[in-house]
């Protein structure tokens, strides 16, 4: 099912962006 694949892809992208933002904020806070 392409819809399920696209949904999981979107979820993975959102999770990656969120984690990257969190790591970036943590690094800025450490500096």
Curated annotation (Swiss-Prot):
It is a single-pass membrane protein. It is found in: Plastid, Chloroplast thylakoid membrane. The chain crosses the membrane at residues 4-26. One of its GO terms (molecular function) is electron transporter, transferring electrons within cytochrome b6/f complex of photosystem II activity. InterPro entries: Cyt_b6/f_cplx_su6 (IPR007802). The keyword Magnesium does not apply. One of its GO terms (cellular component) is cytochrome b6f complex. GO terms for biological process: photosynthesis. Keywords: Chloroplast, Electron transport, Membrane, Photosynthesis, Plastid, Thylakoid, Transmembrane, Transmembrane helix, Transport. Its main location: plastid. The keyword Transmembrane helix applies. The 4 large subunits of the cytochrome b6-f complex are cytochrome b6, subunit IV (17 kDa polypeptide, PetD), cytochrome f and the Rieske protein, while the 4 small subunits are PetG, PetL, PetM and PetN. The complex functions as a dimer. Component of the cytochrome b6-f complex, which mediates electron transfer between photosystem II (PSII) and photosystem I (PSI), cyclic electron flow around PSI, and state transitions. PetL is important for photoautotrophic growth as well as for electron transfer efficiency and stability of the cytochrome b6-f complex. Belongs to the PetL family. This is Cytochrome b6-f complex subunit 6.
């Amino acid at each position: 099912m392409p819809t399920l694949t696209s949904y999981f892809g979107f979820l993975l992208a959102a999770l990656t962006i969120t984690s990257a933002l969190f790591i970036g904020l943590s690094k800025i806070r450490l500096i």
